[in-house]
Amino acid sequence: MHSVTSNAVANAFNNTPSVLIEVAGHLGNMYLCKFGKVVYMSFNSDWTSLVAGDNPNLATVPQGYRPITRCSVKETSTTNATLYINENGSVNCYNYGSAITQATNGNYFACWITGD
């Protein structure tokens, strides 16, 4: 697990540009911040609107958040969701379990990214 605390992540979001996106019919702002190879994302809507099996394309990740060319998510702070960041920067979210429960502190979830 990464050592960055949820407070540090939440504080970083306060000064991070957002991208307007749509997830399962809900509009909201997605915030991105990076600590090393960990990209944290926040979406200010109701993750429970993502039903099991949904795989919406969330957004295009800005170039600054793509330090590696091949990457896959190893962990998230929700047990139901898996994120993939494609080489073109688009992000896909797959929910294989029950509906995703909102996280506290800005509804963020963390993506552990590996690659070279």
PLM features: residue spans?
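Extracellular jelly-roll beta-sandwich "head" domains, especially the C-terminal globular C1q domain
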Residues: 27-28, 50-60, 68-116
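Structured loops at beta-to-helix junctions and adjacent beta-edge loops in soluble globular domains
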Residues: 42-44, 96
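Surface-exposed ligand/attachment interfaces on beta-rich extracellular proteins
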Residues: 13-35, 44-63
